[in-house]
Amino acid sequence: MSDQPADKSANKPDLAAMRRDYTLAALDESAVARDPFTQFECWLDEAINGGCAEPNAMSLATVDGSGAAARPSARIVLLKGVEAGGEAGGLVFFTNYESRKGRELAANPHAALLFYWIEMEREVRIEGRVEKIDAAESDAYYATRPVKARLGAWASPQSQAISSREWLERRMMDADARYGASPPRPPEWGGYRLIPASFEFWQGRADRLHDRIAYARGAQAWMIRRLAP
């Protein structure tokens, strides 16, 4: 019997061969809404009603500064509001202002969002400037969260290194003992609004000839164009 370890590579999936064809729908610039917020809300509704898993989940990309030395980072957050129309219309999410993303947004307020609805063979990319929402708006949303989630906002010094899971659980118990069923909103926790400068709607198509329709904010109206896949 050989003493050589078994070759596990034979059981590994062939990543280079993994692919799927996209055939569910098409996207034409003559048929999209003139306002990208309208188009986005239409697709979001279809993702919700179409059974997509966590349709409001989005990747948020930020950078820690500007210039060649800036480093990007990304994570999944949840969309909690769409404020359509006007110069200040935007997409709202909540987090800890002292987390890595919060610190990066303080250093550079430009960010990108990505929604990927694989069940619909669709993707939406949104880029723009991020600002904090009013404290009253953050208070109102925070009050709707489950009590444990509100206590967790007090317990977790998000993005900081901690000694153990037990340390975090003790912090949770301390927050529960202090605030009980009525924890106030921590001052370092609240909402942001991304004000879009551009949208891109991607619809998967056969043979990798995907449809890409981009919107860019103009002086008077949104400009619409098709991009090569």
Write out the residue ranges for each language-model feature.
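Binding-site signature for planar aromatic cofactors or substrates
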Residues: 1-229
